[in-house]
Amino acid sequence: MLVITRKKGESLLIGDDIEVTVVKLDDGSVKLAIDAPKKLTILRKELYNEVQEENKKATNFNPSILKNIKSK
């Protein structure tokens, strides 16, 4: 893991097309601005983990419950 110290207004580059800038520093939190291609999905880790968990739940579908549905 790379650890970098940045001040407000300073940036770091990831590859050729991603720039992360420190926008604001508060008590115990940092606001970051991320400039990246629109095709790239950027999620907070806790949201990513939540999406992964929902995807796992969706794959546990039991097709036998469809037998109770009447067709028109």
Swiss-Prot record:
Pfam family, one: CsrA
Subcellular location: Cytoplasm
Major site of localization recorded for this protein: cytoplasm
InterPro entries noted in UniProt: CsrA (IPR003751), CsrA_sf (IPR036107)
GO biological process: bacterial-type flagellum organization; mRNA catabolic process; negative regulation of translational initiation; regulation of bacterial-type flagellum assembly; regulation of carbohydrate metabolic process
GO cellular component: cytosol
Entry's Gene Ontology molecular function annotations: mRNA 5'-UTR binding
Gene3D superfamilies: Translational regulator CsrA (2.60.40.4380)
Superkingdom of origin: Bacteria
Residues in coiled coil: none
TM ranges: none
Keywords: Bacterial flagellum biogenesis, Cytoplasm, Repressor, RNA-binding, Translation regulation
Summary of the function given for this chain in its UniProt record: A translational regulator that binds mRNA to regulate translation initiation and/or mRNA stability. Usually binds in the 5'-UTR at or near the Shine-Dalgarno sequence preventing ribosome-binding, thus repressing translation. Its main target seems to be the major flagellin gene, while its function is anatagonized by FliW.
Family: Belongs to the CsrA/RsmA family.
Quaternary organization: Homodimer; the beta-strands of each monomer intercalate to form a hydrophobic core, while the alpha-helices form wings that extend away from the core.
Protein name in UniProt: Translational regulator CsrA
Source organism of this protein record: Clostridium botulinum (strain Okra / Type B1)
Biological classification of the source: Bacteria, Bacillati, Bacillota, Clostridia, Eubacteriales
Gene: csrA
